[in-house]
A protein has these predicted regions:
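Helix-biased detector of long, well-ordered alpha-helical tracts
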Residues: 1-166
C-alpha cells in the first residue's frame, strides 16, 4: 500500500452504534457505464471506465467527522458488511429515504467507487456543507447484522451482497 498518512487514519473498524451511514454520491453509475461499454456506447463520460473520485482536499475536510470508511468497489452491501464486521456492529439501511439508487440492484453492483463512511450524527450539518452530494442512508446498530428496509419498512433480502473474488 502506498500513500501519505493524514493526521488521522480512518479505519473500517471505527464505526459505533448510533453512527450515521453516508455515501458520497449516487450508486449505479458504474453499472450503467459497464452496460454502455458492453454495447460500445461511448458518447458520454463513463463512470465505469473513468471513475470520478473525491479529491484529497474533500477527503481531508471530511476526515475529522468520519469514524470509519471504505470505497464502494464490490457493492454497497458487501463493503458495508466489511465495516460492520471490522467494527463488530450491524446496520439498518433505509434505501428509499432519498433517491441515491435507480434500482435495488445498485446496492450490490459495485464499480461505483463512491466513499461509504460513518459519522456521529452531531456532524451531519458539517458533512452536508463539506460534501453536498452525500446521502445519509442509514444507521450503525449494536446487533451484528445488516437490514435493508424499503419505504414500507419491510426488510429486503439479497442472494448476494456484491462482488466477491473468492
Amino acid at each position: 500500500v502506498f500513500g501519505k498518512q493524514f493526521e488521522k487514519i480512518i479505519k473500517r473498524s471505527g464505526a459505533k452504534a448510533g453512527d450515521d451511514i453516508y455515501i458520497s454520491n449516487v450508486l449505479g453509475l458504474g453499472k450503467q457505464g459497464y452496460e454502455k461499454y458492453k454495447k460500445q456506447i461511448l458518447d458520454l463520460p463513463n463512470q465505469y471506465l473513468k471513475p470520478k473520485l473525491l479529491s484529497v482536499k474533500t477527503i481531508k475536510a471530511l476526515q475529522p467527522y468520519m469514524s470509519s470508511a471504505i470505497d464502494v468497489s464490490d457493492g454497497l452491501l458487501l463493503d458495508l458488511s466489511r465495516i460492520c464486521k471490522q467494527s463488530k456492529k450491524g446496520a439498518v439501511l433505509n434505501i428509499l429515504e432519498e433517491a441515491f439508487i435507480n434500482t435495488i440492484d445498485d446496492l450490490v453492483a459495485g464499480d461505483d467507487y463512491v466513499l461509504l463512511f460513518t459519522s456521529n450524527s452531531k456532524h451531519s450539518e458539517s458533512i452536508r456543507k463539506t460534501l453536498p452530494t452525500s446521502f445519509l442512508i442509514g444507521k450503525i446498530t449494536e446487533e451484528e447484522n445488516i437490514s435493508v428496509m424499503d419505504k414500507e419498512g419491510k426488510n429486503l433480502n439479497f442472494e448476494k451482497l456484491g462482488w466477491d473474488s473468492f
